[in-house]
Every structure is written in C-alpha cells, then in structure tokens.
C-alpha cells in the first residue's frame, strides 16, 4: 500500500499532537495544581480528572510511608537543589555498579561482561542526566541491567525533571514566600500520576502491534534466508520503549534503536512513539499557563515553539523526500530509484516523511531515539537536526524543558520591556540583575559545552581518527556528538567511532554539566523570585500572550542560536549543502 503524500502525513501528525497537548496539558496542570500553589481547575468536561484521586492518593501515601517521606515538609531553593543532587547521585551510583558488574548479576542469559570504567562512567552519567547517549551497543547489556538499571533510571530521571516544574511555578505564585515545595513529593506524584500510567498505555499499544516484551529470554535464534543462523537479542522491549519515548530518554535495547521491528514494528506504533516524544514537553508548557493563572500565556509559548518545530520539520521533510546527491550516478553506473526520496538508512515500513518527522521530534526534544540513521540524511536534513540542537532541542525534555524554555521567555520579557521603556517584569515579578545573570548562565551553557570541545576535537588526533567521513560530514559528526551530549539528547551521527576514552570522558562530563548547571541556576532564580512581591499588571505592562510576544520570542531564540552557532553550522551541514554534498 502506497504511503500518503508528505503533506498529509505532516498535517495529520501535527493536528493529532495539538489535540493531545491540550488534554495532557490540562491533566498535568491538575497533577501539580496544589504543589504549584495554583488555583487551577480543569474544564468541566475534564473534571473527571479529580476522581482519579481515589486511585492515586492511596498509592502515593503508601510510598510516602514506605520511604519515610514527609510530603508536608517544604524546602527552600537550596534545600530543593540538595535533594535533587542527592537523589541523582544515588541513581548514578546504582547505574555505575550495575554496569561494571553485570557479569556477576542475575538474568545475564547470554553471558555479557561488565563495561570498562570509562564506558560505565559515560553510560551512568548519560542515563542519570536523562541524555541516554550510548557509546555501546544495546545488545551488550543483560536483561537485568536493562530492567533494573537502565529501566529504573528511565523513570526516575524524567520524574526529577517533572518535580522541578511546580517548584519553579512557586516563584511566581508565591508572595514573599521562599518555600518551593517538597522535591520527593513531586517526584512521587510525577511517577504515579503521569509517567507510569501513560507509559503503561503506550506499552500495551506496542505489544498489540507486535513489540516484544519478556524478561525470561536473552536471545531469539532465527534461520534467515541469506545469513544462516542469526541470534537476535530480546528483552523487555515494549516496556522500555514506552518510557524511553514518553520520558524523553532515547536509549534502546537494540543498537538500531526504534528502527528495529522488536521495538517499533508497524506504522501505527511509529506514529504513537513519535507523538509520545513531544507530548510531555509541550503539555508542560501548556500547564505552565494554567499554573500561573494565564492559560493564554501558556498557549502563546506553545504556539511559538510549535512554529519552530513545524518549520524545521518541514525543512527535514523537504530534504529527505528529495534526492540524495550521493546516489545520483552518471554514465553507466547503477541507477538508484529516488522517486520516494532519500531511502538510505531508512526503514521501508516508515519511509522518508515519517522518518523526517521522527527525526525532528527526537532532536526537538531531549529524546534521542532514532528510527533511521541520521548520518545517512541529506545535508538539508542534517542542517534541520543540528539547528534543532542549536535552539536547545526546541521543547527540550520532560520537566527541564519547561525551565529551559522559560529562560528564553524571561529574556524575551526583559528585552521587550526595555524596548518599550518599561520596568522589566514577568508575571508580576520584577526582573533584576540577580535573576538575569542566572538566565544568561543557562543560555550560555550550551554554546560553551559544544564549541570549546569541538575546537579541541578537530585538532586532537585521537578524535580525528574516530571520524569515518572526511570534510564537512566528518565535522558534522563531531559537532552532532557534542550537541547531542550538551543538549542532553543522546542521538548520534553513527559514522563517528565514539566508544573511545576521549569521547567517553568528554561526553560524560558534558552531559552532567548540561543537566545540573542549568538546574542549579534555575532553582536559584526561583528562590529569588519567590521572595518578591507580586506587582499588579498595568496598561504599561508587556503583554505576554499576544502574537507580537510570540514573534519576539521566536526572534530571540533564532537570533541567539544563529549568532552563536552559525560559524560551526557553516563548516558542517551548510558547507556540505553549498558544495553539492549529500
């Protein structure tokens, strides 16, 4: 059966996404209503959300008693930050130990060995920071490691991000009150009410479509037509895949990730998984407006990032449904039919359009899971991926994405107020040098972490030897690797041999700094703002829910991203495109 025209696939995807973002956004706003110190109530036709308390509250209370959490103990921003760091250090230690000693742990059905110390450092750092960058093949981990190491981290790290959102909302809903809530309560609510139930629903859909789900076997033996006997690793694919995509994780059980039929078997499963990536991030933006008592402001921010997301996705679709210059053969060479577009590195059950939409969904969030090989994309398609990184992953990750987006929103409000000669403020809180210095720290983290290592890598012989492609594409491979780590994304241009000591250590440090430096600065901003009075809006205040504000926000994001990263992009995908490369 022929695939629908690209414009139809594109339109259907974004229409469904817009509807789901509204419903999930109202639901998420309800989940953290009290924790955000908000008066939000869902619309009447969604009031059934409130009846879910009868199911979730007993589970949460049981977890509080079991873990000794006192949900009523409020924390200042410093206490909140301490809890975040302690919680994540525990996740890192768990992962590091499991990875190093998986050969001595149970459920190691095919006898895989433990990882080297540098690879275990990178893997533990990557999965603790919700990056899930893999310098190993997924098949080299045991079922125990996938289930009780990687799988647990895939739930706890997005829960960490979710727990940051109501704390930051308190910065604007509090009136001279430094308390930001209880981190552990917010983690539990995010797990019980958001991540677990929706991931379970996605996993059921995947199993219905044919995705594998087992913890009892290590591999499947197949007698193939052309390769003889082939051993294929199997495990808890459906369960891991669900939270991998919905929790903006990305690391797969198989090396080919969601391009494999065990993880992503059908076009329907592909649509569900593609939608799962941005739903959590965009619903958080919508929920922000509900928490601060201005739904239209949340819709305005969603609209701004939807415009960027849709535009870059359109560029990717154009690039990948066009021809691959490297496949155009002159003379008597083998002719490659490219009527459907660039099929190199793509699955025939998805095609170039669905692969392009997935590609921008995975780089437009901190997901990083792939259903096609990004290093086989055209120069135009590769540019769209790298520019999505330059915007700090468009909508970014679950929880942390909202906070990173709000740094651009606050910067836009600050610039906009100065442009019209008004005192800078945002949602009734004055913006002063204490907050703005931390906003600039967050915005500068990405370029510092990307460009300095990039400059070192292109002159360091060990890094140069890892490049499998010359020229512009080789430069793009390294740039993509550092973008992926520093934006907490995790995907890769797999032509790069990144499983070396250099890349393990550099990327391992990058993912940690990219995660925890912004969190520290953002909680400090929340602490400063929570202590301030709320200034009533006046006629002279900057409106943050108008098309003009949306346009200004888009302009700030693109200008900041383009000015900082344009030279690097010129040496990579832009140079390749202009030189007639693939």
UniProtKB/Swiss-Prot annotation:
Record bears the keyword Transmembrane: yes
InterPro entries: KdpA
GO cellular component, one term: plasma membrane
Subcellular location field: Cell membrane
Record's bilayer topology term: Multi-pass membrane protein
Induction cue: Up-regulated in response to K(+) limitation. Induced under desiccating conditions.
Molecular function GO terms recorded: P-type potassium transmembrane transporter activity; potassium ion binding
Functional summary from the UniProt entry: Part of the high-affinity ATP-driven potassium transport (or Kdp) system, which catalyzes the hydrolysis of ATP coupled with the electrogenic transport of potassium into the cytoplasm. This subunit binds the extracellular potassium ions and delivers the ions to the membrane domain of KdpB through an intramembrane tunnel. The Kdp system is essential for growth under K(+) limitation, and for survival under desiccation and salt crystal inclusion.
Annotated TM spans: 11-31, 81-101, 148-168, 195-215, 272-292, 298-318, 379-399, 401-421, 439-459, 551-571
UniProt note: phenotype after gene disruption: kdpFABCQ and kdpFABC deletion strains are only able to grow in the presence of K(+) concentrations above 60 uM.
Main location, first listed in the record: membrane
Homology family: Belongs to the KdpA family.
Top-rank taxon: Archaea
Designated name of the protein: Potassium-transporting ATPase potassium-binding subunit
Keywords in alphabetical order: Cell membrane, Ion transport, Membrane, Plasmid, Potassium, Potassium transport, Transmembrane, Transmembrane helix, Transport
Subunit structure: The system is composed of three essential subunits: KdpA, KdpB and KdpC. The complex also contains KdpF, a small non-essential subunit.
């Amino acid at each position: 059966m022929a695939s629908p025209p690209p414009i139809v696939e594109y339109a259907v995807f974004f229409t469904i996404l817009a509807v789901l973002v509204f419903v999930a956004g109202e639901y998420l706003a309800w989940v953290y209503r009290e924790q955000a110190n908000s008066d939000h109530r869902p619309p009447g036709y969604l009031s059934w959300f409130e009846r879910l308390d009868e199911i979730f509250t007993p589970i949460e209370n049981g977890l509080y008693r079991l873990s000794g959490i006192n949900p009523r103990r409020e924390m200042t921003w410093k206490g909140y930050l301490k809890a975040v760091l302690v919680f994540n250090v525990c996740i890192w230690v768990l992962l590091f130990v499991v990875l190093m000693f998986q050969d001595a742990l149970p459920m190691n059905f095919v006898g895989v060995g433990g990882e080297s110390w540098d690879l275990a450092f990178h893997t533990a750092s990557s999965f603790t920071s919700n990056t899930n960058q893999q310098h190993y093949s997924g098949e080299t981990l045991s079922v125990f490691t996938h289930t009780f190491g990687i799988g647990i981290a895939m739930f706890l790290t997005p829960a960490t991000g979710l727990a940051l959102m109501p704390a930051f909302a308190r910065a604007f809903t509090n009136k001279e009150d430094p308390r930001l809530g209880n981190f552990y309560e917010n983690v539990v609510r995010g797990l019980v009410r958001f991540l677990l139930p929706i991931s379970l629903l996605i996993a059921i859909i995947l199993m219905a479509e044919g995705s594998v789900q087992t913890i009892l076997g290590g591999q499947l033996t197949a007698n193939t037509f052309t390769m003889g006997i082939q051993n294929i690793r199997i495990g808890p694919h459906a369960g891991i895949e669900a939270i991998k995509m919905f929790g903006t994780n990305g690391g797969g059980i198989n090396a080919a990730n969601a391009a494999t039929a065990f993880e992503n078997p059908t076009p329907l499963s592909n649509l569900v998984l593609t939608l799962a990536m941005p739903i959590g991030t965009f619903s958080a933006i919508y929920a922000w407006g509900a928490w601060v008592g201005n739904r239209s402001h949340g819709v305005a921010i969603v609209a701004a990032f939807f415009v960027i997301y849709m535009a870059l996705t359109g560029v990717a679709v154009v690039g990948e449904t066009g021809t691959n210059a490297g496949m155009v053969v002159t003379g008597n060479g083998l002719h490659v039919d490219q009527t459907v577009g660039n099929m190199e590195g793509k699955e025939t059950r998805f095609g170039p359009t669905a692969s392009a939409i997935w590609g921008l969904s995975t780089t437009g969030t901190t997901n990083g899971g792939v259903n096609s090989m990004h290093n086989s994309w055209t120069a135009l398609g590769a540019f769209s991926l790298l520019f999505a990184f330059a915007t700090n992953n468009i909508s970014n990750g679950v929880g942390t994405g909202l906070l990173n987006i709000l740094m651009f929103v606050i910067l836009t409000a600050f610039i906009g107020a100065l442009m019209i000669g008004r005192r800078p403020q945002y949602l009734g809180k004055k913006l002063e040098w204490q907050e703005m210095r931390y906003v600039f720290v967050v915005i500068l983290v990405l370029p510092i972490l990307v460009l300095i290592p990039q400059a070192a890598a292109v002159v360091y012989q060990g890094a140069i030897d890892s490049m499998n492609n010359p020229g512009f594409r080789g430069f793009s491979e390294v740039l993509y690797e550092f973008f992926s780590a520093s934006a907490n994304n995790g995907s890769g241009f797999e032509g790069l041999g990144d499983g070396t000591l250099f890349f393990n250590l550099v990327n391992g440090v990058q993912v940690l700094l990219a995660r925890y430096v912004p969190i520290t600065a953002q909680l400090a901003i929340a602490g400063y703002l929570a202590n301030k009075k709320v200034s009533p809006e006046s006629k002279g205040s900057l409106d943050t829910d108008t098309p003009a504000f949306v346009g200004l926000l888009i302009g700030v994001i693109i200008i900041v991203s383009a000015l900082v990263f344009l030279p690097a992009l010129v040496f990579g995908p832009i140079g390749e495109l202009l030189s007639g490369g693939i």
